[in-house]
């Protein structure tokens, strides 16, 4: 596991110097034939590295160790064959170069199509889902929308923290790999067959460095997008909180006004009832007074009638008294 991790770190970033820089500075001038053969070797090595790099672009990161070992074995065998057959490699150089160019063009075209398709999906699909979600959430009550936005804000906060943590780890790894690459560049002076191996390692480090830089850039963009979404959701959350606070205040005002109206209505009704009760009491009092007056008048009238009857019929009284 440690050896694999070390190899992965070695294949992650490239130094700024390679073995050719040291050899070109220290080597004496070569004859024309030896220089042409060396140029052919160098060109074939670059073409082979170029083709291997293009074929390895679509692989996953976990399979880089195995593919780099296979590429090293193939390139070692190619170097031995080129040293034995220098004249034959001169004729095969052009064909390998054009094949690698065609392969590079096809790989770039396919990767460009994949990137364009993925970019369209990333741009169109989130926009459509965002519009649908917005229409769906606008029909909700404010409290439910506030609850959902709080949950989404918490999830985005966790995601943002994870992205920041990954970004910090990637920056730390980048710094460590650059230090290791610089140390390897200073100590990188092995002659012979080790030169081609170091060239391949340098190329792999360059490829991994570009990939790491792309990953860091993507993480930075995702972090920025997450921050923008969090800012937008925080604004919506604040607006919803303001709306809920206003609705609560309005509800309290309406409740207070309703209580005041009910109190006034109760007082008015009680006043009306008291007035009606007083009027009824007055009527009863007047009725009692009239009844007393009528009873007295009837009594006086009865006495008067009785006296009149007695005075108008004395014989009847006399006869009645006799009998």
Swiss-Prot record:
Belongs to the CCDC160 family. It comes from Mus musculus (Mouse). This is Coiled-coil domain-containing protein 160. Residues 48-58 have a biased composition (Polar residues). Residues 1-81 are annotated as: Disordered. Keywords: Coiled coil. Residues 144-289 form a coiled coil.
């Amino acid at each position: 596991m440690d050896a694999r991790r070390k190899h992965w770190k070695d294949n992650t970033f490239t130094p700024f110097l390679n073995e050719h820089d040291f050899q070109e500075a220290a080597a004496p001038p070569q004859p024309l034939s030896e220089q042409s053969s060396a140029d052919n070797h160098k060109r074939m090595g670059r073409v082979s590295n170029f083709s291997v790099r293009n074929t390895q672009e679509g692989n996953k990161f976990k399979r880089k160790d195995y593919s780099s070992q296979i590429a090293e074995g193939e390139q070692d065998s190619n170097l031995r064959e080129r040293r034995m057959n220098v004249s034959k490699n001169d004729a095969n150089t052009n064909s390998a170069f054009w094949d690698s160019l065609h392969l590079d063009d096809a790989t770039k075209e396919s990767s460009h199509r994949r990137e364009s398709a993925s970019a369209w999906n990333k741009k169109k699909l989130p926009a459509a889902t965002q519009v649908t979600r917005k229409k769906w959430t606008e029909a909700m009550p404010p409290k439910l929308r506030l609850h959902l936005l709080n949950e989404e804000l918490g999830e985005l906060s966790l995601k943002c923290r994870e992205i920041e943590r990954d970004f910090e780890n990637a920056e730390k790894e980048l710094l460590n790999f650059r230090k290791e690459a610089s140390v390897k560049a200073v100590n990188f002076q092995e002659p012979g067959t080790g030169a081609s191996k170091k060239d391949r390692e340098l190329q792999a480090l360059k490829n991994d460095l570009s990939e790491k830089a792309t990953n860091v850039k993507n993480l930075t963009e995702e972090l920025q997008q997450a921050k923008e979404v969090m800012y937008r959701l925080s604004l919506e959350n604040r607006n919803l909180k303001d709306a809920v606070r206003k609705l609560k205040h309005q509800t309290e005002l309406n409740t207070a006004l309703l209580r005041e109206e009910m109190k006034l209505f109760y007082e008015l009704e009680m006043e009306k009832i008291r007035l009606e009760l007083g009027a009824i009491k007055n009527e009863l009092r007047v009725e009692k007074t009239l009844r007393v007056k009528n009873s007295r008048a009837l009594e006086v009238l009865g006495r008067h009638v009785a006296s009149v009857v007695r005075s108008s019929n004395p014989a009847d009284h006399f006869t009645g008294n006799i009998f």
